[in-house]
Amino acid sequence: MAVRSPTHPAGPVAEAFAVRVRALESSALSPAATPSYPAARERPEEECGLRTPFQRDRDRIVHSKAFRRLKHKTQVFVAPEGDHYRTRLTHTLEVTQVSRTVARALRLNEDLVEAIGLGHDLGHPPFGHIGEAALDDCLNERFGRRFKHHEHSLRVVERLERDGEGLNLTEPVRDGILGHSGRAPLPRTLEGRIVRLLDRVAYINHDIDDALRAGVLDEADLPREPIAVLGATGAQRIDALVHDVVESSERAGDIVQSAEAGEAMSALRDFMFAHVYLADAARAEHRKIEHVVRALFGHYCEHPDEIPPLVPDADLATRVTDYLAGMTDRFCIRTFEALTLPRAFPSF
């Protein structure tokens, strides 16, 4: 039975909306595009008269608590002092923006790309990839399980949002969220594959920009060969990579990049791991992050009564993981301090 939500009486625009969208997509989109109708949900719902199913998914994601928390989650630098460093939220918006550009050029479904892009990192834990690795280690050592943020992003939209009801997103959006990571199987739609590839394009280039701003890198440090291929500035590199994806994908009938661009991007990624992500200067901060995550994980395993009832029927490992992965950087630090630092006695 379809879920009915309170709506205004349908007027002539609403009554004709789906018909018009189908006609527009039939004439404007590529035959390889994912159509907006029909779009299956786990729990069937009546269609909206003014939004496509993928637009409704986008709106549910944007209005979710997990989406709002992204503004206080690390992209690369933990709690940077400047106002212009990227967060997990700005990264999400940048991935979505460049993904929509590619989708439009290839005549694919922009609404679907937008929903996947906005939702792809909802399950990322605090402190970026270092926090993810620390949580994964804790979970594996204590329970023999693994943590992968793309799988947890799907759990967020399916179970954790709306007090355990989930957002009831369409199947293509859920598939794209799950498949956005290189460690996951390819998404079934071309739109999902766009987000998967453009996520890497965005974060490598934007992380370089932040590292230059922070003084961790100098322009002269960047490797010459990939810079010669892609461009000297961040804007040039993004432009070159986006054009390459569009032209290569149009020829291939799939979402791909040329061998030359792929090799240049991989070289930049290797450079960033060696000189930024895993550099000696960052190791001390990484150890602090690992200490905080381990301390909180151990504490909540021993004191599960302190975990809010996000999903009451979940087992201990899942409850601890859900709670820690949902924390922002600053909430995680405040919680750690409250549990480990002595408090001043009240004066008498």
Predicted regions and their residues:
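Active-site alpha-helix of zinc metalloproteases
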Residues: 115-116
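Short active-site segment of divalent metal-dependent hydrolases/proteases
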Residues: 119, 123-127, 202
